[in-house]
Amino acid sequence: DTDRPLIIKVASIQSARMQVYFIDNDDYFQRKHVIADSNGREFEDNDERALFFARGVIETVKKLRWAPDIVHCHGWMSALVPVYLRSIYSDDPIFNNFKVIYSIYDNDFKSQFRSNFADKLRFDGIDAENLKLIKKPDFVNISKLAIKYSDGLIIGSETINEELTKFLKTVKKPILPYQDESEYIDAYNNFYDEMLS
């Protein structure tokens, strides 16, 4: 419930004729380490960083008026994007006809998010039914929430969390198994085509 400035940085990849947008904030992302400090202690505000990132990405897409065909979320830092898109932003015309794909990686965070994480989501407008899924705000439950709100899933690492592997066997959604580096580009393109057809 605090205001933090959203900084959008733009870079170009000339050879691909592509622009890349970076979501930034001095308080959340100007650190020497990404998830944990040099002693391996996970940052206490990783929950707020994930919330800020999700809202920042979605608000940037809205501001630039990009109507996506596919929103591909990679890893737990983006896990709230599917939730927000399918709940808070579900009536926004920019997000009218698109698919969400969530890639799951072997990048578990080990500690739980802070105990008031559900309150932060409630403040953002996430309903009580969804908050039940994250009563224990850990990597597995936050990933399950992302899986629930995604249309398709990609296994991005050779091995992933064992509990998520079991959970995926119960999910009735298209799942692309892990692809070797030499094959993943074609496999992803085919998966995107399948999701859009």
Language-model segments: residues:
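Catalytic cores of nucleotide-sugar-dependent glycosyltransferases that transfer UDP/GDP/TDP-activated
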Residues: 1-197
